[in-house]
Amino acid sequence: MKIYVVATIAWILLQFSAWTTTDAVTSITLDLVNPTAGQYSSFVDKIRNNVKDPNLKYGGTDIAVIGPPSKGKFLRINFQSSRGTVSLGLKRDNLYVVAYLAMDNTNVNRAYYFRSEITSAELTALFPEATTANQKALEYTEDYQSIEKNAQITQED
């Protein structure tokens, strides 16, 4: 009887851990302090290689074609400078920005995100530095018109 109880508990623990695992987040960084053309080229190549599907080709060329996400839903891009780091959260399947992380004037990491594109739990996995209390959903949507309106600019500017 004890073996059945142990087996059942082990099965529940394994199932629970499978239910709660989050995709690992890939982070790619560009150091903006004295960057070189080679560093920038390497940075762009890392992004391309991370999202491309090696089995997809465009017109028989070696141009990277975005494949379905196989390494997690999001990609973290960090831009480092002498004054700090700004991080972008990108959707892996289209490279759209869904969130960003920056330190505010009080040295607190704050994450801002499009609620329709990423959940708070996914944001926590992407930017663990920003606690749930320091996450803020943006008050506008991710389409260009909404962003322009919120920034108070137009395409003519």
Swiss-Prot record:
GO MF, one annotated term: rRNA N-glycosylase activity
Reaction catalysis annotation: Endohydrolysis of the N-glycosidic bond at one specific adenosine on the 28S rRNA
Keyword Hydrolase: yes
Biological process annotations from GO: defense response; negative regulation of translation
InterPro entries (alphabetical): Ribosome-inact_prot_sf (IPR036041), Ribosome_inactivat_1/2 (IPR017989), Ribosome_inactivat_prot (IPR001574), Ribosome_inactivat_prot_sub1 (IPR016138)
Record's signal peptide: 1-24
Keywords, alphabetical: Hydrolase, Plant defense, Protein synthesis inhibitor, Signal, Toxin
EC code(s) of this entry: 3.2.2.22
A Pfam family assignment: RIP
Source organism, top-level taxon: Eukaryota
Record function comment: Ribosome-inactivating protein of type 1, inhibits protein synthesis in animal cells. Useful as immunotoxin for pharmacological applications.
Family of this protein: Belongs to the ribosome-inactivating protein family. Type 1 RIP subfamily.
Name of the molecule in the record: Ribosome-inactivating protein saporin-4
Gene: SAP4
